[in-house]
Curated annotation (Swiss-Prot):
PROSITE patterns: AAA (PS00674). GO terms for cellular component: cytoplasm; microtubule; perinuclear region of cytoplasm. Its main location: cytoplasm. GO terms for molecular function: ATP binding; ATP hydrolysis activity; microtubule severing ATPase activity. This is Probable spastin homolog Bm1_53365. Gene3D superfamilies: 1.10.8.60, P-loop containing nucleotide triphosphate hydrolases (3.40.50.300), Phosphotransferase system, lactose/cellobiose-type IIA subunit (1.20.58.80). Homohexamer. The homohexamer is stabilized by ATP-binding. The homohexamer may adopt a ring conformation through which microtubules pass prior to being severed. Interacts with microtubules. Keywords: ATP-binding, Cytoplasm, Cytoskeleton, Isomerase, Microtubule, Nucleotide-binding. It comes from Brugia malayi. PANTHER family: AAA DOMAIN-CONTAINING, SPASTIN. Its EC number is 5.6.1.1. ATP binds at G218, P219, P220, G221, N222, G223, K224, T225. CDD domains: RecA-like_VPS4-like.
Length: 454
């Protein structure tokens, strides 16, 4: 029987892994869902699969009560649980909408398999599990180029650690910079640093040699991940490794740094490569006396690998980190990310453009004159991109709520009245900005002293 403290630690690790994995899957699902048209059944079904797996991980994490983890982590678990409950309902709503558009068919390969989540074992060491989810259909059939066969990518890499990392390779998709609304300064900086050097490498040498570490920071829900994907999409033959913090961690001493080493070796074998690490602050925060030996050794290995990458003129590698807490990153880590770009909430013009784009893209009928659009742009001050998407979804439901169940049953979508400014006003009572002004000012102050902003 496990000691109570070890059981509490095990419960927390199980919760945290499920939390991180659910967040990653749902974020990936939303990205695919939002950029694909309603006629793109293949991509919509991929998004559905992401949502289903995300829901299972949400439910797995929510089964663990805060009082079952060790005391110093209970407030964190409570906070995450509240957010997960909201996200779970939102994800179920998205999945339900897609299932109505694309009913399940017999003998489809995209049928979802139960999540095989492995709780960390305290009693005996096992091989580190880099990814505890089943491989999604999006990543299952990776189309490697001739130079990027599995054997070539794993050259000089322990398959035990490198094999699961290959599942993080994303196939090139059609996300482009032009698909992203707002964030003009960030897009321009990324184009100069990443995209243009691939067009004419000889021009970008010497003092014009691009940075190999970029930090995207800003409030959540403003497209940091989508920007990184757009960079990979614009670069054509570049391999894109989308690595979560959970994929780089292991509680067994010695394994975490081997995972980091394997990651960079795979990136070198398949270069040019972009390594994208979301929530980088969760694994590379400032070093202190209380951190574990595992964490300290992993950070040291990451620094060594970054130094090796920066000192080599032959390596065509780029590491992009994303965080909403840049001030918590270790100073030595920050030095490896000389390009630090604030991804702020959209301004009035970008907010209006995003709202109108969503309405038009989804073929949602609306009645908004020029003056009303300007009013709506002013009302939504402080809303993030994801907040605006949620607001549009809520506003689209208002006309339906005016109808009886009988009316809804016999109504076709084209007969539904258009969305008005009043509908958005009602929706704003339910959908509030997820980012407070205090957080924004803190991030902008950081950008003014240590980063780049508009």
């Amino acid at each position: 029987m496990l000691h109570p403290q070890k059981l509490e630690q095990q419960n927390y690790e199980t919760f945290n892994k499920a939390y991180l994995k659910s967040k990653q899957l749902v974020t990936e699902g939303v990205s695919i869902d939002e950029i694909s048209s309603n006629n793109d059944e293949q991509r919509k079904r991929i998004a559905m699969e992401k949502y289903r797996m995300g829901i299972e991980y949400f439910e797995k994490a929510l089964k663990i009560s805060p009082d079952k983890v060790y005391p110093e982590k209970r407030s964190e678990v409570i906070t995450h649980r509240e957010a997960m409950k909201r996200n779970l309902e939102a994800t179920k709503g998205r999945l339900s909408d897609l299932e109505k558009m694309f009913p399940s068919k017999g003998n489809r390969n995209l049928q979802h398999r139960p999540v095989q989540f492995v709780s960390p074992s305290i009693s005996k060491p096992q091989t580190a599990q880099l990814s505890s989810r089943p491989i999604s259909s999006e990543k299952k059939n990776i189309n490697y180029s001739n130079a990027r066969t599995r054997s070539n990518l794993l050259k000089g890499v322990d398959d035990k650690f490198g094999g699961p990392l290959l599942n993080e390779i994303l196939n090139q998709d059609d996300v482009k910079m032009s698909d992203i609304i707002g964030a003009e300064t960030a897009k321009r900086a990324l184009e100069e640093t990443v995209i243009l050097p691939t067009v004419n490498p000889s021009l970008f040498s010497g003092l014009r040699q691009p940075a190999q570490g970029i930090l995207l920071f800003g409030p959540p829900g403003n497209g940091k991940t989508l920007l990184a994907r757009a960079v990979a999409g614009e670069c054509g033959s570049t391999m894109f490794l989308n690595v979560s913090a959970a994929s780089l961690t292991s509680k067994w001493v010695g394994d975490a740094e081997k995972i980091v080493r394997a990651l960079f070796q795979i990136a070198r074998n398949g270069q040019p490569t972009i390594i994208f690490i979301d929530e980088i602050d969760s694994i590379l925060c400032e070093r202190n006396e209380k951190e574990t030996e595992v964490s300290r050794r992993m950070k040291t290995e990451f620094l060594i690998q970054m130094d090796g990458m920066l000192s080599s003129k032959d390596d065509r590698l780029l590491v992009i980190g994303a965080t909403n807490r840049p001030e918590e990153l270790d100073s030595a880590i920050l030095r490896r990310f000389p390009k630090r770009i604030l991804i702020d909430v959209p301004n009035a013009a970008a907010r209006l453009k995003l709202i109108m784009s969503l309405l038009e893209k989804t073929k949602t009928s609306f009645d908004l004159g020029l003056t009303q659009r300007q009013i709506l742009a002013e009302w939504t001050h402080g809303y993030s991109n994801s907040d605006l998407v949620a607001l549009c979804r809520e506003a689209a439901m208002v006309p339906i709520r005016d109808l009886s169940r009988k009316d809804i049953k016999n109504l076709v979508s084209t007969e539904l009245r258009p969305i008005t400014l009043r509908d958005f006003e009602i929706a704003m009572k339910a959908i509030k900005p997820s980012t407070n002004e205090r957080m924004l000012q803190k991030l902008r102050k950081y950008a003014a002293t240590a980063g780049q902003s508009d």
